[in-house]
UniProtKB/Swiss-Prot annotation:
Protein name stated in the entry: DNA-directed RNA polymerase subunit alpha
Positions of the UniProt region annotated as Alpha N-terminal domain (alpha-NTD): 1-236
Function: DNA-dependent RNA polymerase catalyzes the transcription of DNA into RNA using the four ribonucleoside triphosphates as substrates.
Assembly mode: Homodimer. The RNAP catalytic core consists of 2 alpha, 1 beta, 1 beta' and 1 omega subunit. When a sigma factor is associated with the core the holoenzyme is formed, which can initiate transcription.
Taxonomic lineage of the native organism: Bacteria, Pseudomonadati, Pseudomonadota, Gammaproteobacteria, Vibrionales
Length: 330
């Protein structure tokens, strides 16, 4: 029993009922009241949608150009064959993200997963799975199948746009169901510890496709859940700070020399005599100040005002922190 009223009970693995090699019931108890549904629903969702595995993603069938066709001597049409290939349970050695396997069969009778030719890195978990039927002794079928590692469910339509430019005619895409879990359900029953009768017992009933044992699937799902919850333990901000683009302190045009204004020689010389070297120096002067400049009359003043106006500037502007360090150093 827990040491204090604030201490949570921790579940322990009570029973694993192995119904078959692909079907098992796992029971966990005791759980605090309400935790049966909390944990059961979280594990169920992960097991259904987020478990990694391997699946058929592409197939090339000799003599077939598209999925809306049939093949002579084969009972099923191509769409049915693709649907049957989705049910292929394949285990690929760790470290390999994709492999190719081949199928060549002739003669009347069913074509099953066990007829597939593959190397030691591939294992077919359901060799009796039917892919199609050949209808006569002269019928034959040959195909090259691509198996990839992934997670969850990825429909063929989601890969069409990304692979359209590279996919040759005759290479057929297959909806990929990577999850090794076929069925998953959970039930919450009453549990008791000493005098407490308000506890939960979680019973997980699961079937896999044979590429992963049910017990191992639950372990992996629990690991995924724990890793996702780690971020909530200390709630640190792990966002990478965005690099803000530094805006220039002054408009670049203000840093250009007054010579760039292409004033008349008379006006330019008058400004240089007053130590007005940059446009930023000029725009801070007023009309009155410029008219006090020797040899600079109203005609030159009008010229300066017009040239500045054409660049969106004017006399009498106030520039804080002028001059900038780059100019001051010069």
């Amino acid at each position: 029993m827990q040491g204090s009223v604030t201490e949570f009970l921790k579940p322990r693995l009570v029973d694993i009922e192995q119904i078959s090699s692909t079907h098992a019931k796992v029971t966990l108890e005791p759980l605090e009241r309400g935790f049966g549904h909390t944990l059961g629903n979280a594990l169920r969702r992960i097991l259904l949608s987020s478990m990694p595995g391997c699946a058929v993603t592409e197939v090339e069938i000799e003599g077939v150009l598209h999925e809306y066709s049939t093949k002579e001597g084969v009972q099923e049409d191509i769409l049915e064959i693709l649907l049957n290939l989705k049910g292929l349970a394949v285990r690929v050695a760790e470290g390999k993200d994709e492999v190719f396997i081949t199928l060549n069969k002739s003669g009347s009778g069913p074509v099953v997963a066990g007829d597939i030719t593959h190397d030691g890195d591939v294992e077919i978990a359901n060799p009796e799975h039917v892919i199609c039927h050949l209808t006569d002794d002269n019928a034959e079928i040959a195909m090259r199948i691509k198996v990839e590692r992934g997670r969850g469910y990825v429909p063929a339509s989601a890969r069409i746009h990304t692979e359209e430019d590279e996919r040759p005619i005759g290479r057929l895409l297959v909806d990929a169901t990577y999850s090794p879990v076929d069925k998953i359900a959970y039930a919450v029953e009453a549990a008791r510890v000493e005098q407490r009768t308000d506890l939960d017992k979680l019973v997980i009933d699961m079937e896999t496709n044979g590429t992963l044992e049910p017990e191992e699937a639950i372990r992996r799902a629990a690991t995924i859940l724990a890793e996702q919850l780690d971020a909530f333990v200390d709630l640190r901000d792990v966002r990478v700070p965005e690099e803000k683009e530094e805006k220039p302190e002054f408009d670049p045009i203000l840093l250009r020399p007054v010579d760039d204004l292409e004033l008349t020689v008379r006006s330019a010389n008058c400004l240089k005599a007053e130590a007005i070297h940059y446009i930023g120096d000029l725009v801070q002067r007023t009309e009155v100040e410029l008219l006090k400049t020797p040899n600079l009359g109203k005609k030159s003043l009008t010229e300066i005002k017009d040239v500045l106006a054409s660049r969106g500037l004017s006399l009498g502007m106030r520039l804080e922190n002028w001059p900038p360090a780059s100019i001051a150093e010069d």
